[in-house]
From Swiss-Prot:
Reactions this protein catalyses: tRNA(Glu) + L-glutamate + ATP = L-glutamyl-tRNA(Glu) + AMP + diphosphate
Recorded GO CC terms: cytosol
Subunit structure, as described in the record: Monomer.
Family annotation (InterPro entries): aa-tRNA-synth_I_cd-bd (IPR045462), aa-tRNA-synth_I_codon-bd_sub2 (IPR020751), aa-tRNA-synth_I_CS (IPR001412), aa_tRNA-synth_I_cd-bd_sf (IPR008925), Glu-tRNA-ligase_bac/mito (IPR004527), Glu/Gln-tRNA-synth (IPR000924), Glu/Gln-tRNA-synth_Ib_cat-dom (IPR020058), GluQ/Sye (IPR049940)
Organism: Pseudomonas savastanoi pv. phaseolicola (strain 1448A / Race 6) (Pseudomonas syringae pv. phaseolicola (strain 1448A / Race 6))
Sequence motif 'HIGH' region, location on chain: 10-20
Keywords from the named record: Aminoacyl-tRNA synthetase, ATP-binding, Cytoplasm, Ligase, Nucleotide-binding, Protein biosynthesis
GO molecular function: ATP binding; glutamate-tRNA ligase activity; tRNA binding; zinc ion binding
Residues the entry annotates as binding ATP: K254
Residue ranges of the motif 'KMSKS' region: 251-255
Protein's name according to its UniProt entry: Glutamate--tRNA ligase
Domain of life: Bacteria
Protein function: Catalyzes the attachment of glutamate to tRNA(Glu) in a two-step reaction: glutamate is first activated by ATP to form Glu-AMP and then transferred to the acceptor end of tRNA(Glu).
């Protein structure tokens, strides 16, 4: 009997996302319920954004939640390497195989040519897609350009008529027309694969039998299925999980909800409660009880109990459930966990240098730096009263800074200050006009340690969370303001 093997393959391009943890949990439970193996693979082919720091955060976040893997970059295994950036020769081999079989082809189009192609198609009211012009090149022309070292990508051929039947474990057979599919790039000019080729090759070579992934990938499933057919490989069983949603039913995003697992750890949530809550995202226990452990979920796991309606990720409900877990702890364990959370040595060492020179007794630390250990803060609304700026301008400055911070890839003090300065300069203000607002929103106080130091230590999700809280305290942002300010954001360097 074939051993069930599932996997999670996150990209290390930022803080570990709750959506990644959600999909990891369901893959883990499915594998363990069937006596199988759960694998961790790292999709780090985006060399500009991928970092080893983010990779380690993924490891730490999943382990904090109690999800372990039997094979992966940090534990090894018989199917390594488990980082896609270390498997380049493997992808090159299989891409070339597709070319030789006539299922893929080199494309020499420049970015300018592709932009022009899309513009012409849009002008005609057509869906922008690659028009296949490289297929018209003769073999001799292709070889000449390859020999000359001309930059190129490898694209896959796709049918132009008919439908692809996608067998989904949740929805049954889903029909998707082939004319919706583009001639997907498989290998980029830098010699690294795109998601589609790497996914299929890795899943096959690693013996993955079942793939549970987010439903946002369902529309592109025909490309994956076609690649399996081109290679002549058996495809794994596919399951497209419903996406997590904000309370307003929009797709879960950091603009409306904190999305980092690290944020919830820092906020003092219990990992058991986090797993429990994610387990209730579109799934339920046979007896419908709300509180259950990871092992109880594994023991009772059945994909037929997954609901296709978009599950709502609601922090208030998560907080309620976390309270149930906290109150059920023996008091000794409650005290022990509180100590571990509040007096984390690594976190304390980040804070201490910014506090030590500002106090004369230890008792002065809490009033000065207590905000480092809180989830949110409750600043007095009077702290946002400004001699120079109107209430609307105050909210505009804070909202624009929040948006700029959302685009920050590297969370460092100098880059944080760069975002603040960019907004201030564009609005023709001075730094001293904005910094008191940041102090109030982030620390809840008029003065404290350097606010940019504090933001760096608190991290991106907690910083953004407090800015959103402050904006809500000031009445929020109207739809009209949101639209106008987003246009303004586009012109800020």
């Amino acid at each position: 009997m074939t051993t069930v093997r599932t996997r999670i393959a996150p990209s290390p391009t930022g803080d570990p996302h709750v959506g990644t943890a959600y999909i990891a949990l369901f893959n883990y439970c499915f594998a363990k319920q069937h006596g199988g193996e759960f694998i961790l693979r790292i999709e780090d082919t985006d060399q500009l954004r991928s970092t080893r720091e983010s990779e380690q955060q993924i490891f730490d976040a999943l382990r904090w939640m109690g999800i372990e893997w039997s094979e992966g970059p940090d534990v090894g295994g018989p199917h390594g390497p488990y980082r896609q950036s270390e498997r380049g020769d493997i992808y090159q081999k299989y891409a070339q195989q597709l070319v030789e079989l006539g299922h893929a082809f080199p494309c020499f189009c420049t970015a300018e040519e592709l932009d022009e192609m899309r513009a012409e198609q849009q002008a005609k009211g057509e869906t922008p897609r690659y028009d296949g012009r490289a297929l018209l090149l003769s073999k001799e022309e292709v070889q000449r350009r390859l020999d000359a070292g001309e930059p190129h990508v490898i694209r896959m051929k796709v049918p132009t008529e008919g439908v692809c039947v996608v067998p989904d474990m949740l929805r049954g057979e889903v029909e998707i027309p082939w004319d919706r599919m583009d001639m997907q790039v498989l290998m980029k000019t830098d010699g690294l694969p795109t998601y589609f080729l790497a996914n299929v090759v890795d899943d096959h070579l690693m013996g993955i039998t079942h793939v549970l992934r987010g439903e946002e990938w369902l529309p592109s499933a025909p490309k994956l299925i076609l690649l399996y057919e081109y290679f002549g490989w058996d495809k794994p069983q596919l399951c497209y999980m419903p996406l997590l949603r904000n309370p307003d039913k929009s797709k879960l995003s950091k603009r409306k909800n904190p999305t980092s697992v690290t944020f919830y750890e820092r906020m003092g949530f219990m990992p058991e409660a986090m797993l429990n809550y994610l387990g209730r995202m579109g799934w339920s226990m046979p007896d419908e009880r709300e509180k259950f452990s990871l092992q109880e979920m594994v023991d009772n796991f059945d994909l037929s109990r997954v609901s296709l309606g978009g599950p709502i990720f609601d922090i208030e409900k998560l907080s309620w459930l976390n309270g149930q877990w906290l109150r059920d702890l023996p008091v000794e364990e409650f005290a022990s966990r509180l100590k571990t959370w509040a007096l984390n040595p690594d976190y304390m060492m980040k804070i201490a240098p910014h506090v030590q020179g500002r106090v004369e007794t230890f008792s002065q630390v809490a009033p000065l730096a207590g905000f480092f250990f809180a989830g949110g803060v409750t600043p007095d609304v009077k702290l946002f009263e400004h001699k120079k700026l109107s209430p609307e301008q105050v909210r505009q400055v804070m909202q624009l800074i929040l948006w700029k911070l959302e685009s920050l890839r590297q969370w460092e003090k100098d880059r944080i200050m760069g975002c603040i300065q960019a907004v201030v300069e564009h609005l023709k203000l001075k730094l001293r006009d904005a910094m008191p607002l940041m102090f109030a929103a982030i620390t809840g106080q008029a003065n404290s340690v350097s606010v940019t130091d504090a933001m760096e230590i608190l991290g991106p999700d907690l910083t953004r969370f407090r800015l959103r809280q402050a904006l809500d305290l000031l009445g929020g942002v109207s739809k009209k303001e949101n639209k106008e300010w987003e246009k303004l954001l586009g012109s800020i360097a």
